[in-house]
Amino acid sequence: MVVVTVFRSRLREGVELDYQSVALEMERAVKTIDGFLDQRFYLADDGERVTIVRFRDWDSQRRWAEYPSHREAQRRGREEFYSWYDIEVCEERTSHEFSFLEES
């Protein structure tokens, strides 16, 4: 089973540099969590940010949710960085992958 966290957000005006510093710190920290699988970041043309983080199981996801520096980053996010955010955490029920490989 894989647990997927989808974090969508919008930043307040003028916080980009401070936000990037904290985001980089969190990007490094989450990789230390036992059960962390991978993460991806996307930025839409309208400014919405999307972070997708995958964990091996619910215990791994919970360790991250309760990780002290992550809790502090969440607090700062609410107080300093975000004008809006939405978090969805769910179990991956199915997964399909396709990869086209050209012959050389």
Where are these regions (language model features)?
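Short S/T/G/P-rich N-terminal loop/turn motif that feeds into the first structured element of a domain
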Residues: M1-R49, W58-E66, Y82-S104
